[in-house]
Design a protein with these regions (language model features):
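Carbohydrate-binding surface patches
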Residues: 195-235, 241, 284-287
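Acidic, Ser/Thr/Pro-rich beta/coil linker or hinge segments at domain junctions
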Residues: 235-278
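Flexible loop/turn segments at secondary-structure boundaries
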Residues: 18-23, 69-75, 140-146, 184-185, ...
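Generic recognition of flexible, low-complexity loop/linker segments
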Residues: 1, 50-54, 120-123, 133, ...
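Conserved, mostly hydrophobic/aromatic
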Residues: 12, 47, 67, 134, ...
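Noncatalytic carbohydrate-binding groove/subsite architecture in carbohydrate-active enzymes
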Residues: 1-121, 127, 180-195
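Catalytic cores of secreted or luminal carbohydrate-active enzymes
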Residues: 121-138, 143-194, 285
């Protein structure tokens, strides 16, 4: 496509949905969710290389990652086979109706899915020179970021991951170097086995004019906090820890408990000396104010 039609193309689209087997254990579903963004990073890297190699005249064709998510499909979840006689809206309506009849129409993202979204955002930040647009479907209900009903509305874990990165990040991505213990996972669902995955996944953004640096840290360990030492190459005058967390990986918000998962902000006494601890199964934006040189 890049070679034949590259001069006419503004973006090339990538999609990825991570999906476990229907009988997958909770552990397998957890590790699929927190490693799927690494697979997305691999796909972006391969696509970047292919596009750059074949685009005409060295043209930079950016990537639009306009469909992505993680799906936890239970064996009882309805299967709707696409039919050429149905429109997309008719197909979705039938899918929703069957799901509601079986009580499984809403995925209702858990904390681990919020980590999936945060990890995906970190992948985008590390590829900000190539990935210029990304969209998420859907916004409300079914597989939405927001759940609504007669009792009101609440934001899911993925909603709060969006909120964390929208409100606590800078306009410019910067490179980081991470030294972290690693883990490996077996092949699950549509994802291959992976080795050497760091428990700590980190990206960074900055606002030079405000002398602000944000470290976007995801602790993928489901049970253990991790203490880290941070070197930003400058003095730190203030640190605020913005944390997305909950009681456990499968904690969910609900109409009766809409803030079981939420973003909290804590001003720290820590200003760079000594280790800083990131809770198990959490996503953080560590907001640092840097000293004048």
């Amino acid at each position: 496509v890049a070679r034949i039609a590259g001069e006419h193309i503004d973006n090339i689209t990538l999609h990825h949905y991570a999906q476990a087997d229907e009988d997958a254990s909770r552990d397998d579903q957890y590790w699929l969710a927190v490693t799927a963004p690494s697979r997305i990073g691999d796909l972006i890297a391969m696509s970047r290389a292919t596009i750059d190699a074949h685009a005409p005249g060295g043209k930079r064709i950016p990537i639009s990652f306009d469909e992505w998510n993680v799906i936890h499909r239970h064996a009882k979840y309805p299967r709707v086979i696409a039919n050429g006689d149905w429109s997309a809206l008719e197909h979705q309506a039938l899918f929703t109706t069957l799901g509601e009849q079986m009580g499984v129409a809403h995925q209702d993202y858990a904390l681990v899915d919020g980590l999936y979204a945060a990890l995906f955002f970190n992948v985008l930040l590390r590829n900000a020179d190539h990935v210029t647009m990304a969209n998420q479907a859907q916004l409300v209900n079914l597989f939405g970021l927001i759940e609504t009903g007669p009792a009101g509305a609440y934001g899911t874990a993925e909603y709060h991951a969006f909120r964390l990165y929208v409100e606590q990040s800078g306009p410019t991505a910067v490179a980081v170097r991470v030294d972290s213990p690693t883990f490996e996972v077996r092949a699950t669902g549509n994802l291959p086995a992976r080795q050497g995955e760091p428990y700590l996944d980190v990206a960074a953004t900055q606002d030079i004019e405000r002398r602000k640096l944000w470290l976007h840290v995801v602790n993928r360990h489901p049970r253990e906090e991790i203490a880290v030492r941070i070197d930003v190459g400058a003095g730190i005058t203030e640190a605020v820890h913005h944390l997305l967390g909950g009681r456990g990986p499968w904690t969910r918000n609900s109409f009766t408990d809409p803030e079981a998962i939420a973003v909290s902000s804590t001003h720290l006494d820590w200003v760079g000396a000594g280790p800083l601890t990131f809770p198990a199964c959490s996503a953080s934006s560590l907001e640092l104010t840097l000293a004048e040189p």
